[in-house]
């Protein structure tokens, strides 16, 4: 490797998760040991991207389904929190650093994606400011450590895509989703509830506010499990649930639909659901987390 390899630093290490490799490794092992293996080998997972103290244990339920003896390349699709983006963007670097070990971007796949003309480049500043992809790097490194020399990653920052763009990107990524050696990591939290998020939907028939939030999230999760992008869009239009990874999820659902049209049999199941706290009053706020996995039969 030349000294000119460009790196993205682990900019959220030391704040959103520990910067100590040994501590991080032990933490991730601890959470993974609490989760069951039930949907292996996963072809895609949905997992949260909050600080690990909030969602580390939830995310483990998705990562437990990853089979390092099968997976060789990990696509990480994360929503853009800081820059307005109407398409998807690729990184400008070669290496993503983690406190565990460096992850190498698959430049061959990046080249093929770039050639489509559907992507833009994100600046290093945007790359390092964004946490939605980075929060999946330590878990990716941990679950793949037994095969780390064969591993490449394909980070993709997903913008505020229209439904037709979600369909186009879904179609493009479907050929990669068809390959058993690829894993898709879809980065998303679920409901952001409270006045600070300007979202306070409440169905009183559910009882406490946190129960209403759970019911709303699980309605959306049920639609995702049906792998139905149109229904998912309709659900978001109706309830406006603040699912920050709605566009990466939309891309996955469209990719899955494309493969199902071609006779590929698959199923998606959620394995864990959690809330950062239980909202009982209008002063409260919470973020929901869900972990799930897609398997191809």
UniProtKB/Swiss-Prot annotation:
Disulfide connectivity for this sequence is: none
User: What name goes with this protein?
Assistant: Protein MEMO1
Family membership noted in the UniProt record: Belongs to the MEMO1 family.
PANTHER family according to UniProt? PROTEIN MEMO1 (PTHR11060:SF0)
**Role summary:** May control cell migration by relaying extracellular chemotactic signals to the microtubule cytoskeleton. Mediator of ERBB2 signaling.
Query: Coiled-coil ranges per the record?
Result: none
HAMAP family, alphabetized: MEMO1 (MF_00055)
**Could you name the domain of life of the organism this protein comes from?**
Eukaryota
Pfam families given in the database record: Memo
Q: How does it assemble?
A: Interacts with ERBB2.
Which CDD domains did the record assign?
MEMO_like
């Amino acid at each position: 490797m030349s000294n000119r390899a460009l790196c993205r630093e682990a900019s959220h290490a030391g704040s959103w998760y520990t910067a100590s490799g040994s501590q991080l490794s032990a933490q991730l092992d601890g959470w993974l040991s609490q989760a069951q293996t039930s949907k292996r080998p996963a072809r895609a997972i949905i997992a949260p991207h909050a600080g690990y103290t909030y969602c580390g244990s939830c995310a483990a339920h998705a990562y437990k389904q990853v089979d390092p003896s099968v997976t060789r390349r990990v696509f990480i699709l994360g929503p853009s929190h800081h820059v307005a983006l109407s398409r998807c963007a690729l990184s400008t670097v070669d290496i993503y650093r983690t406190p565990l070990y460096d992850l190498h971007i698959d430049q061959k796949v990046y080249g093929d994606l770039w050639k489509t003309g559907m992507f833009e480049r994100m600046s290093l500043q945007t790359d390092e400011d964004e946490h939605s992809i980075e929060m999946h790097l330590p878990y990716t490194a941990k679950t793949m450590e037994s095969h780390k020399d064969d591993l490449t990653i394909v980070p993709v920052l997903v913008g505020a895509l229209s439904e037709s763009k979600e369909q186009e990107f879904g179609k493009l990524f479907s050929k990669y989703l068809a390959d058993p050696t690829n894993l898709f990591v879809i980065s998303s939290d679920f409901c952001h509830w409270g006045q600070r998020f300007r979202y306070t939907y409440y169905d009183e028939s559910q009882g406490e506010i946190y129960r209403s939030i759970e019911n709303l999230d699980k309605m959306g999760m049920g639609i995702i499990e049906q792998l139905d992008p149109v229904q998912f869009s309709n659900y978001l239009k109706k309830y406006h649930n603040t699912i920050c990874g709605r566009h990466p999820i939309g891309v996955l659902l469209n990719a899955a639909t494309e493969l199902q049209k071609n006779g590929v049999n698959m199923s998606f199941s959620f394995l864990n659901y959690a809330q950062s706290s239980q909202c009982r009053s209008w002063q409260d706020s919470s973020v929901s987390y869900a972990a799930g996995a897609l398997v191809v039969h």
